[in-house]
Amino acid sequence: LSLGNELQYDFEFLSSLLNHVKEKDPRHLYTTTSFTFEKGHGDWPETNDDFFITQWTRKGWVRGQGVFNTESPRFDKDYSASVEGMEVPLITHEIGQYAVYPDLKEIEKYIGILDPLNFKGVKEDLERKGLADKADDYLMATGKLAALLYKEEIERAMKTPGISGFQLLDLHDFPGQGTALVGLLNAFWESKGVTEAATFRQSCAPVTPLARSKAVYTTDEPFEADIEVVNYSDKTINNGIIGWKLADRHGKAIAQGEFPARSLPVGENSMTGSVRCPLDKITEAKELTLSATLKGTAYTNEWKIWVYPATLSVDKGNIVITDRFTVA
């Protein structure tokens, strides 16, 4: 239990209050606040916290907001450096918040006392600019990107041994405080059509296969990935076998295999095996899909991998390429 969300100001009082509720009802785990912007607090647990909820620590970010804009896409990163030395469980705070363009078809759903003036304003602006026919394209483009970011956000948390859980800001749009189109579902808890429940569940399930790999390769290097499984179900999985496949967009296998059976304990990240295969037979830029599945179950996950030729001949024609003005 938390005393509140993003509490600020008198932490001496909050600490005494936390001690009081612990004495009154010691059955639960308590924390002072679900994150805080208060100076001098919020980047490390308070003295009496049983667990810690935050966006960052004194060592760095623990959510993608401070990461994804500064590095190229890859699947082999986590937040271990930011949580090193943390002595209580850490939960990441209000992760996600990736905005999706308004679905203007939603306007007609408001038939009560609420009036979607924000959506109407966007629609009028598009109409003035002659872009009304692009609204669905904008929705899908931003929605697909948001879904990819949510996937990577959740998986990085799961890959980090020192992180015990995560909180999305919301799975659906929040209409109660300005415009917050942060959901993969709309304000009516309906799908926006940018992802499916089964797809989202691949990277957010009680048992989730995870991959540590680069996202971009050239044909002169081998594809490499470590496959692990996080088990947050209610029981140990005995003799779990992970099958994997690297395939092109038509489903044709570039390589595939499975790892030896092993136990997958509850509450742990279990390394199941490593994949290594050459890419030198690929002659043009390709999108590949790496998939990993716990055999005999519905638990599966997949990642898009991009492969480019190591060298590319360019027909320059009559164009002169030079770094000297006199030659130009």
Question: Model segments located where?
Answer:
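Carbohydrate-binding surfaces of carbohydrate-active enzymes
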Residues: Y110-A328
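Substrate-binding/catalytic cleft of secreted carbohydrate-active enzymes
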Residues: L1-D173, G178-L185
